[in-house]
Design a protein with these regions (language model features):
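Short metal-binding segments enriched for Cys and/or His
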Residues: 26-44
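Short linker/helix segments within small regulatory modules
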Residues: 12-22
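Amphipathic alpha-helical segments that form the core helices of the histone-fold
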Residues: 80-94, 104-110
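Basic nucleic-acid-binding interfaces
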Residues: 23, 35, 47, 53, ...
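Short Cys/His-rich "knuckle" micro-motifs
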Residues: 5-12, 36-39
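Conserved phosphate/pyrophosphate-binding and hydrolysis machinery centered on Walker-type P-loop NTPases
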Residues: 54-55, 76-79, 93-101, 125-129
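Long C-terminal interaction/binding lobes of large macromolecular proteins
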Residues: 102, 108-112, 118, 123-148
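Short cysteine-rich clusters marking metal-coordination/redox-active sites
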Residues: 1-3, 26-27
Length: 148
């Protein structure tokens, strides 16, 4: 495809909650392809537990969530939905910096209504569980929330 400008738009639709536009295009020779227009988000700094700062990395968060919850989520799409929801919540704060603790809390909020085992697994990594009592405490907390 030499020049995207020669193509015509066949279909347009909003995706990612209005944060992007997906366009189906057709080249003069009849070939079809898809383009995406995304809103560029401002840089977001993460303040780590050590006090150091680094840029928010969606891929890093996705890998951390996938690793910690194992196979307890139904699909990669479910992990992606969690990461998107967390990212949206972070940008909705309107701050240029966010703590790693806030990110972990947002992930726990998303996992809480998706999969209880994934929630406990992530909590054990995020909150650095060291004893069985740590597990018992989080399980009792989740049970009280579920019953109440």
């Amino acid at each position: 495809m030499k020049n995207i400008g020669d193509s015509r738009v066949v279909e347009s639709r909003e995706v990612s909650g209005g944060m992007a536009i997906r366009r189906r295009r057709e080249a003069p020779d009849g070939r079809r392809f898809t383009t995406y227009e995304r809103i560029e988000k401002p840089n977001l700094a993460v303040i780590k537990r050590s006090g150091t700062r680094e840029l928010f990395d969606r891929t890093k968060l996705s890998l951390a969530v996938s690793r910690s919850v194992g196979k307890f989520l139904k699909s990669d799409e479910e992990v992606e939905a969690i990461i998107s929801a967390v990212e949206d919540a972070l940008y909705a704060l309107g701050d240029s910096e966010v703590s790693s603790r806030q990110i972990g809390e947002f992930v726990l909020d998303e996992l809480a209504h998706r999969n209880e085992v994934a929630y406990v697994r992530f909590a054990s990594v995020f909150q650095k569980f060291e004893t069985l009592d740590d597990f018992v405490q989080i399980l009792e907390k989740r049970k009280a929330i579920k019953e109440g």
